[in-house]
Amino acid sequence: MTTDTTDLELRTSRLLPASPAEVWDVYTDAEKQKVWFSILVEEPGIVRIETDLRVGGQQSAVWGPSEDQLFTEVQTFLEIDAPHRLVTESTGSTPDGQTMTTRIVVTFTAQDGGTLMEVVQSGFPTVEIRDFFVEHAWSGAFDRLAAYLTR
């Protein structure tokens, strides 16, 4: 995994063990997301995801350890070039009501028999939140995607 944290934008990537079409499908299909979202968690808790994968459509995700500790994220699809590029505007909120809106660009490029999945996310309100997404959110997502793809 490589990471560049310029200003309040992050750039991170991981080589995943599947074709771009397979990685795209696992990343964008709501039923598959429900599996990989909690694949490395001993007690998965709650995961609800609905996706309308079209420009202008939205993905709504709700997850957390219990009903009173739920995180939410609504992504609006701005650009879809399957299975190569996905651009969204993401608005997320924490259980205590804090919200944040960012722009996410994800690309899927065939490389070395797998797929280089690259993420550029911008619009973070603080360096600390950006760094959390680098160190935990995207790193964890890549780990879970890899676990799903190799199960």
Feature annotation, model-predicted:
Residues L116, G123-R151:
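A conserved amphipathic terminal alpha-helix motif
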Residues K34-V35, E42, I49-R54, S60, ...:
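Hydrophobic-ligand binding "helix-grip"
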Residues T28, T102, T115:
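Ser/Thr-centric signal marking residues that sit
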Residues V23, Y27, Q33, Q59, ...:
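Hydrophobic pocket/interface hotspot
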